[in-house]
């Protein structure tokens, strides 16, 4: 960082100082130097942070908008930021996230967690609109008011506060006739989870944001409980290593993992990855408290299936056979190895499964919905017999 102006920043948990580092956040060189670790507060360091300069940099990068997010370039350009300066994004949005209560405080800022946190303070509706649509004018505002900068995932999305609660609005993919059905799958997958008794986030459908169909779900984190994706706790070894890790946490965690594998086999979830399941952390103690509820099921229930499938059983069956899980080899093999007696009871409830068409004004065409229902029933039979 020779010849550049380095600034000191402190990673805080609420207002508790944890680690101070020095970096030039506007430089292409992301080199940073740890100045101090507050040993008396070490137990409150993020569980997914390795105390090293590379580890701090990785942790910071996890708190920036992903490069594959829809409209990411439009959003950043409107506020004068660049994907090529990820630490610059951190400096601008203070590393705030709706996943937890950590943040990055610049030396001498005078800020407090109460003043800047995303759980209590207003969001920028202008930035939310740009994040969701890609359209909008360049603006000058505090980026600390925009949770979109630290939200993962590639689909267009934004957060809104309504009646004292925080909701995530998420759109679908676009451009081709077989795309854009992810919001439906989010809602219908929740219905399957309800019948099975699996702990999953409730999704509804709405067009109250720019008249675009999108899914809507309530935030499941808070100032009391935060979320850590399992991939930030178990970095290698795949599902085998994750099972072993969950066994160290207790039976409740193993049960949740087994439920997830059976559920994903039923809904044919091709996008379960190490970033969209994990654990909840008690923010008072900074210790793992419970498995996180399941969420992010837009790439399930054949949401990418072409229009030629829904009146052609043979074509649909051939298509369904091509769909594979992302994080392990085979849906049914993984589910059967995880199954316990309780799962048989869950699966029996699906043998005559039907979606609740009265739950929303927005449903898939009847032929498509009927085909998916039949496949849910079939997949339950495969696991039972």
Where does each model-flagged region fall?
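Phosphate/dinucleotide-binding and metal-coordinating scaffold of catalytic cores
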Residues: 1-262, 266-268, 280-385
